[in-house]
């Protein structure tokens, strides 16, 4: 009988399979951590925008609030959206006593995160035009719109 030297094909496939599992697990952990970090940064950015808007316009009313106004006043650095696509806005209600930060193009997961996270700076949240804090109005197809209202 001949003696074997080296590894068998089964052993090599087993080692490669273990390596593939480790790589895919690492990728999944990275993705989860990355998404969580992006959402935390977006949350803090929204809070910062709301705080600076209140500081600038609380006593004079929010009628003229806009992204361009906040950039010109130095409250925010750019018109880059904190989350979702780049189609976002800051608007006031009719009498100027309240303003909203409107984010468009949010995925279902982002929508669910922002509607379930407690944000003490908001008076209420609107999801796809419905006033609610429940995720039941988040569309699974994506392209969700959330408005955060503050006074």
Regions found by a protein language model. Give the residues of each.
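Periplasmic/extracellular, small/polar-rich flexible segments of pilin-like filament-forming proteins
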Residues: 58-151
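A generic structural signal for solvent-exposed, polar alpha-helical segments
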Residues: 33-36, 94
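N-terminal alpha-helical signal peptides/signal-anchor transmembrane segments
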Residues: 29-33, 43-63
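Charged, low-complexity, helix/coiled-coil-prone segments
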Residues: 10-19, 53-65
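N-terminal single-pass transmembrane signal-anchor helix
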Residues: 1-34, 42
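Generic detector of well-ordered secondary structure
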Residues: 24, 32, 51, 113-116
């Amino acid at each position: 009988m001949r003696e074997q030297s080296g590894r068998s094909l089964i052993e090599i496939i087993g080692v490669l399979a273990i390596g593939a599992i480790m790589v895919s697990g690492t990728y999944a952990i990275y993705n989860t951590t990355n998404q969580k970090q992006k959402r935390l940064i977006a949350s803090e950015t929204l809070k910062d925008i709301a705080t600076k808007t209140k500081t600038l316009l609380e006593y004079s009313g929010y009628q003229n609030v806009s992204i361009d106004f906040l950039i010109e006043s130095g409250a925010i650095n750019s018109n880059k959206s904190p989350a979702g696509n780049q189609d976002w806005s800051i608007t006031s209600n009719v009498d100027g006593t309240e303003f909203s930060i409107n984010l468009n193009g949010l995925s279902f997961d982002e929508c669910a995160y922002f509607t379930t996270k407690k944000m003490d700076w908001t008076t209420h949240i609107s999801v796809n035009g419905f006033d609610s804090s429940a995720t039941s109005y988040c569309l699974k197809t994506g392209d969700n719109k959330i408005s955060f209202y503050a006074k």
